[in-house]
Amino acid sequence: MSNTRICVKQLPKHLTDKRFKEHFEKFGTVTDAKIIKKDGKSRLFGFIGFSTEQSAKNALSLNGTFIDTSKIVVETATVASETTENRPWSKYSIGSSSNKRLTEMEKEKEKKELKRKQDKLEQQSNKKQKKSHTNSLLDAELENDPEYQEFLNLVAPQANRKVWENDDKEIGKINRGEEEGEEGEENDNQVEDGKLPFSGKKKIELDHGKNKDLLVFEDADASDEEDLYEDMPTAPKKQNKKDDVDSIINEKKKKHDSSVSDLDWLSKFRSNNDEIIEKNQSIVYRDEEESEEEDVNNKENKKDKMKIDDNKENKKEKKKDKKKNKKDNDNDGDDDESKIKPIKYFEHDYTKEDEDVGESGRIFVRNLSYSTKEEDLEKVFSKFGKISEIHIPIDYDSKKSKGIAFILYLIPENAVQALNDMDGKVFQGRLIHVLPGKAAPAKQFSENKDNNNNGAEGGSSSFKAEKEQKQKTTSGSTHNWNALFMRSDAIVSSLAERYKMTQGQLLDPNQMDLAVRMTLMETHVINETKKFLEDQGVIIQDIGNKGSKRSNTVLLVKNIPFKTQEHELHELFSKFGELSRVVLSPARTIALIEYIHPNEAKVGFKNLAYSKFHHVPLYLEWAPEGVFKLPAPPKEIKKSEKSEKSSDSSNDKKEVESTTKTAATTTTTKKGTDNNTQFVYIKNLNWKTTNETLVGKFKSLKDYVNVNIATKANPKNPSERLPCGFGFIEFSSKQGAYECIKKLNGSSIDGYEISLKLSDKNETNVQEINKRRELPENSKQSIKSNGGQPNKPSSKIIIKNLPFESTIKEIRKLFTAYGEIQSVRIPKKPNGGHRGFGFVEFLTEEEAKNAMEALGNSHFYGRHLVLQYAEQDKNIDELREKANLDYEKIKNSTF
């Protein structure tokens, strides 16, 4: 895609879109100007779109300039979807040098942090090793200390001690300490009561999961947590140590006593677990009830919300019913149902209305520039495949584009490719959006119903209606187009009125050569029409060329009756749009209609093709592109020209009558040039220079008339025209031409220094030069039959599409009017009939050329004659030389 969009940064905060656009308008047509904003505040950058790439390149020269006191940065804008993105620069963007340095620094920090943690762990491990070493030494020293071992046994919690762990040790101690046995018995009694030797304390069990015994004071509250973790009391004197040990041993003996029942033994270890469990269960039950209540409340709230939404929806439906003034009384039932049914949202059913772009082949393009033309879209989208139709909707009040377009491809797969590739791309300075398009509406405008009924008495049959419908659908096909087709009755009526004869006298059915005379009369009227169209500024050579590109505003109207008037055609075609000009030939057999806007021309073509006009169907055809030399004059000039034409009408009629008498023996002549008209030759033009650029350069000169750049056909794409690098400027006087050369010779246009001089050949039409660079239509058709080379002019003509009723006598009489005929030959079939083609050989090449130009658009027995140069017969010397070569080959060959 072309770079037609630029990005401007560092804009002033106070800059408006209007002023932003005006600042860049001097470089070309601005199609889009937008300052990016957030929350109503400028983000200090914006985008400018131009219609041409050259304008965008010229606008880049403002880079580094100032708007007010802000130095702006101007650069080419890039699309986010393009793969060729700029190199990242932010430290947060992957791939930038700043981001690389930042990641390296972070990696180094991580390494240092990891090393620091490892060192710290090593230090801690060393400390632990030292501590464990010292502890091992202390343990070794204290292992044999009996007092220390007794202390450890007493300090250790009961849960961590096994019942049988110290039985042997305790028994040994009892033997050694019999003297203190009495004190041990007293302590045993205290342990049986569930109390420790120190007063004021009792044992309770709170944690039912781990069965841990905790000590609590008797006079302390249960909620006092500090008392639970109070320090143990100081140990009694040494004389009580043996008593404590004896009490513990006695308790263990009682635990192992067989006389004690299991229930009594287990009752000692019973704690408050049951109470805690009951409390927890009550809490659980209460939580479940509360959660159920909350669920019920939530459901009720949801129902209330649904009712509110349903009520709102019902109110909206009632308002719609009031606006539409419906008389149905079913609204109450619908409202009741809406309370139960869930809310429904509108969903567009694409499956019914929108076809898949792979089937329809039609795409929808939006956000186009309002100056976009069909030719611009065709250049861009034709690279994906052949385009059948391009439609740009317009506003019929302003006659301007709406910024959208529909493109129909001949092959649907090409539309899919265009949709994927062109969506979001820049076109003429705007980001276009390509979407699948709906199928074209199959509606037709029915006009002149009364005229249609007149065409067939009693109404048209189904077969006839089907045939007419088929003709309308194929009206855009070029296979049956014939630019200069004329009705036979219109030709006869025109000549009969001109020579003041009846049609019967003119035709004279008693004579045998009626078909020949009819063809000659048609040729006479065609030549007369060609001369008239040339006078009206029509390039007649383009009309018969089927390979030329077609216009989208000019229509050729054929098969019209002789009584047709110009105002009738204007009234008929102006129903579908504004006309710029209407050209009707003097014989009233063919007309040219030009619309101002292409869309209106398309509507007129579709609705009037094969429609009844008076009593005959209209044959419409798109005229070749550039068929008019000059654009249509304004309406005020047309009125002044009409008065001039009325005064010269008598002289024109005399000239027409004098030329028609000799039309059969002469060919169409070129329009003579005015003696005062002068042409200036321009060379060394830039390949990108257009006619509009030259017009802007030379229109201010004295006696300026017109300017044209010579073009040639593109070998790769024959429908495309390429500039030749030179052109011609037309002046109405020699003085204006000399003044142009004196002032502007050596000046520069688009960066190229041009050279001006008077034209040697004094060409009146640059299109004639362009035509010389193209192959003629007849020669193009005969390339394949001549070894890939076009046929050269010769005195022999081949006639194709001959009617089977024709005879050699009729063909000789038809061509005798254009020169002396040397021979006529029609190849025949074995059954006696001819094969549909023949050969006519004239005495000179000039006579053959006259016959081809005169009869190239004529009809014989209703068939269009196709004329081409035939290959010249070889003379006797060439035949002898060929025979000698063949004889030598046979002689030298071995059998």
UniProtKB/Swiss-Prot annotation:
<dbReference type="GO" id="GO:0003729">
    <property type="term" value="F:mRNA binding"/>
</dbReference>
<feature type="compositionally biased region" description="Basic and acidic residues">
    <location>
        <begin position="296"/>
        <end position="316"/>
    </location>
</feature>
<dbReference type="GO" id="GO:0005730">
    <property type="term" value="C:nucleolus"/>
</dbReference>
<protein>
    <recommendedName>
        <fullName>Multiple RNA-binding domain-containing protein 1</fullName>
    </recommendedName>
</protein>
<feature type="domain" description="RRM 1">
    <location>
        <begin position="4"/>
        <end position="79"/>
    </location>
</feature>
<dbReference type="InterPro" id="IPR012677">
    <property type="entry name" value="Nucleotide-bd_a/b_plait_sf"/>
</dbReference>
<feature type="compositionally biased region" description="Basic residues">
    <location>
        <begin position="317"/>
        <end position="326"/>
    </location>
</feature>
<dbReference type="InterPro" id="IPR050441">
    <property type="entry name" value="RBM"/>
</dbReference>
<feature type="compositionally biased region" description="Basic and acidic residues">
    <location>
        <begin position="265"/>
        <end position="278"/>
    </location>
</feature>
<feature type="coiled-coil region">
    <location>
        <begin position="96"/>
        <end position="134"/>
    </location>
</feature>
<feature type="compositionally biased region" description="Basic and acidic residues">
    <location>
        <begin position="635"/>
        <end position="658"/>
    </location>
</feature>
<feature type="region of interest" description="Disordered">
    <location>
        <begin position="769"/>
        <end position="796"/>
    </location>
</feature>
<dbReference type="InterPro" id="IPR003954">
    <property type="entry name" value="RRM_dom_euk"/>
</dbReference>
<feature type="domain" description="RRM 2">
    <location>
        <begin position="361"/>
        <end position="439"/>
    </location>
</feature>
<dbReference type="GO" id="GO:0006364">
    <property type="term" value="P:rRNA processing"/>
</dbReference>
<dbReference type="GO" id="GO:0005634">
    <property type="term" value="C:nucleus"/>
</dbReference>
<feature type="compositionally biased region" description="Polar residues">
    <location>
        <begin position="778"/>
        <end position="794"/>
    </location>
</feature>
<keyword id="KW-0175">Coiled coil</keyword>
<feature type="domain" description="RRM 3">
    <location>
        <begin position="553"/>
        <end position="625"/>
    </location>
</feature>
<keyword id="KW-0694">RNA-binding</keyword>
<dbReference type="GO" id="GO:0019843">
    <property type="term" value="F:rRNA binding"/>
</dbReference>
<feature type="compositionally biased region" description="Basic and acidic residues">
    <location>
        <begin position="101"/>
        <end position="113"/>
    </location>
</feature>
<dbReference type="InterPro" id="IPR035979">
    <property type="entry name" value="RBD_domain_sf"/>
</dbReference>
<feature type="region of interest" description="Disordered">
    <location>
        <begin position="223"/>
        <end position="340"/>
    </location>
</feature>
<comment type="similarity">
    <text>Belongs to the RRM MRD1 family.</text>
</comment>
<keyword id="KW-0677">Repeat</keyword>
<feature type="compositionally biased region" description="Low complexity">
    <location>
        <begin position="451"/>
        <end position="462"/>
    </location>
</feature>
<feature type="region of interest" description="Disordered">
    <location>
        <begin position="442"/>
        <end position="479"/>
    </location>
</feature>
<feature type="domain" description="RRM 4">
    <location>
        <begin position="678"/>
        <end position="761"/>
    </location>
</feature>
<dbReference type="InterPro" id="IPR000504">
    <property type="entry name" value="RRM_dom"/>
</dbReference>
<feature type="compositionally biased region" description="Acidic residues">
    <location>
        <begin position="179"/>
        <end position="191"/>
    </location>
</feature>
<feature type="region of interest" description="Disordered">
    <location>
        <begin position="634"/>
        <end position="670"/>
    </location>
</feature>
<keyword id="KW-0539">Nucleus</keyword>
<feature type="region of interest" description="Disordered">
    <location>
        <begin position="84"/>
        <end position="136"/>
    </location>
</feature>
<dbReference type="Pfam" id="PF00076">
    <property type="entry name" value="RRM_1"/>
</dbReference>
<feature type="domain" description="RRM 5">
    <location>
        <begin position="795"/>
        <end position="872"/>
    </location>
</feature>
<feature type="coiled-coil region">
    <location>
        <begin position="284"/>
        <end position="331"/>
    </location>
</feature>
<feature type="compositionally biased region" description="Basic and acidic residues">
    <location>
        <begin position="241"/>
        <end position="251"/>
    </location>
</feature>
<feature type="compositionally biased region" description="Low complexity">
    <location>
        <begin position="659"/>
        <end position="670"/>
    </location>
</feature>
<feature type="region of interest" description="Disordered">
    <location>
        <begin position="172"/>
        <end position="200"/>
    </location>
</feature>
